[in-house]
């Protein structure tokens, strides 16, 4: 069983390398037309250059997974902001794509919790489609739209989970098929359990990104031993191994909050279930210390009898 690792957005080991610098719309409004254009251009250019720095860091450390920042283009989906963020940076998008393809990196996006398809308000669904389209356009500009995924949560329950799920199935029909083909769903820590998310994924033929921390915060009746094989099966129509999210609770009191690093004891039960299936899968670390937490966790795992480190960020068990 091969386990590959990655982290989210910011490389903590790199100085001054945020790929998510932004500008608020309030600040944007105060600028002249030319100043607005210059500001959007400068911030986006810096985010793209920082992303390239991070990719070089990942390549040097043999880190095969990486989640791109959704904020890579500031105000990209704001209805009052017009900005050709694709055409203006074609060489940089292509450079990012070349690095990803040459080194066979698995990159993804994870829009925020407001991108959802369970609302009964049409403008919420419209906004979700706009946001998904933005993420897809970026992947397309990079040249990896057919091999990378955009991960979201199911959404809210709005007092009636069954009705909300019905709306999801209806509203998702409005998302262009080529974008839906590149989306994944993740169980959340308060509303939609692993079993409920799995059922939706199976009906819509959407790959399931399993989050173990969320699962433990929002348990369902079905045991993980039964759920995980079916979760992995949702990836069978793709050419990519399943991906899971790993993080640890900040504390018993703040169980849903992410800790700085990974607590191996918290994760062990999941790993033992995964080992019984013995299926290769990828792990996205969602701890606050990001790449540093990932490398420390890999080091701890590699000290366990039977687990072999076969590269900087890949283990065999």
Swiss-Prot record:
It comes from the Bacteria. It is an enzyme of class 3 (hydrolase). Its EC number is 3.-.-.-. One of its GO terms (molecular function) is endonuclease activity. Signal peptide: none annotated. One of its GO terms (biological process) is response to UV. Pfam families: UvdE. InterPro entries: UvdE, UvdE_bac, Xyl_isomerase-like_sf. Keywords: DNA damage, DNA excision, DNA repair, Endonuclease, Hydrolase, Nuclease. The keyword DNA repair applies. Component in a DNA repair pathway. Removal of UV LIGHT damaged nucleotides. Recognizes pyrimidine dimers and cleave a phosphodiester bond immediately 5' to the lesion. HAMAP family: UV_endonuclease (MF_00606). Belongs to the uve1/UvsE family. This is UV DNA damage endonuclease. It comes from Bacillus cereus (strain 03BB102). The lineage of its organism: Bacteria, Bacillati, Bacillota, Bacilli, Bacillales.
